[in-house]
């Protein structure tokens, strides 16, 4: 399994402070077995830098990473890294586009799904957002099809995962709450499930009717204050060998550290038994 960790700390306008690390996990159920940082030489300040990287997926031995550019101009891109050894630079291609996205998942053939943070124009009150089915060509993200979906989860859109067998999963979390001592907290996450073949026709404010994907199930994970001060799910995947859902989590200890702040760590959680509940629309 591969994971990515953004290291911008909000310093988008200072490339020297922006970087992302890619990690390889031989066995994600072990915190020590075969865990290594890949020596891709993607360093701060270089044109090839991943900067504030969020979503990532793997297809045909290539990693596809969604990135925000640290220039304050609202530029975003997908970087394709052709995986090699851990001691060499990997060939890469950057594909730019105008929409902010934190999530990517392989769809079919050379197509991918990008989850945008852009609501359908005029339909923001209904929490309807865009899923773009895209391919990559000549340094650009090319949109082949736009699908709309209703967000029946929380306010913040996080990671996605799609497969023909399991359908589409979307991670949502409650908004972050900031504290004077620098602590950041979110108290709940909800994973939505969408059957891409099922839609509901809805009339938008432009007078036209559009097919809208409606989540059919949701998996809630509320904050357990006895275990964590904050618990933020960021990405989701399905283990193809066990059919277990696995999620990456940024969590903070419930016990404050020496500086009065709650130390944060990254976790991988595996849910071996999940009870899906029907979302109320």
Q: Which role fits each region the language model picked out?
A:
Residues 1-16, 52-55:
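Beta-strand-rich domains and repeat architectures in extracellular enzymes and scaffolds
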Residues 18-61, 67:
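Blade-loop segments of beta-propeller domains
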Residues 28-49, 90-97, 139-154, 201-229:
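Surface-exposed loop and turn segments in beta-propeller and other repeat-based domains
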Residues 47-55, 94-107, 152-161, 228-237:
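Repeated scaffold domains used in trafficking and secretory/extracellular systems
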């Amino acid at each position: 399994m591969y994971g990515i960790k953004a290291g911008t700390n909000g310093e988008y306008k200072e490339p020297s402070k922006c970087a992302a690390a890619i990690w390889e996990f031989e066995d994600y159920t072990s915190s020590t077995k075969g865990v290594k940082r890949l020596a891709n030489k993607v360093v701060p300040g270089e044109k090839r830098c991943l900067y504030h990287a969020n979503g990532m997926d793997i297809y045909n031995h290539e990693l596809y990473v969604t990135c925000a550019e640290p220039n304050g101009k609202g530029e975003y891109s997908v970087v394709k890294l052709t995986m090699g050894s851990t001691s060499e630079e990997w060939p890469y291609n950057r594909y730019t586009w105008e929409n902010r996205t934190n999530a990517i998942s392989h769809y079919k053939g050379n197509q991918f799904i990008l989850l945008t943070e852009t609501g359908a124009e005029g339909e923001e009150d209904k929490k309807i957002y865009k899923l773009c089915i895209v391919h990559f060509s000549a340094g650009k993200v090319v949109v082949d099809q736009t699908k709309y979906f209703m967000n029946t989860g929380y306010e913040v859109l996080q990671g996605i995962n799609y497969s023909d067998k399991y359908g589409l999963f979307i991670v949502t979390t409650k908004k972050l709450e900031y504290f004077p001592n620098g602590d950041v907290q979110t108290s709940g996450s909800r994973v939505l499930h969408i059957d891409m073949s099922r839609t509901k026709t809805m009339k938008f404010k432009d007078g036209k009717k559009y097919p809208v994907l409606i989540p059919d199930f949701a998996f809630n994970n509320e904050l357990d204050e006895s275990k964590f001060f904050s618990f933020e799910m960021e990405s989701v995947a399905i283990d193809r060998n066990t059919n277990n859902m696995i999620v990456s989590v940024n969590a903070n200890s419930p016990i404050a550290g020496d500086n009065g702040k709650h130390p944060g760590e990254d976790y991988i959680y595996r849910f071996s038994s999940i009870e899906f509940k029907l979302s109320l629309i």
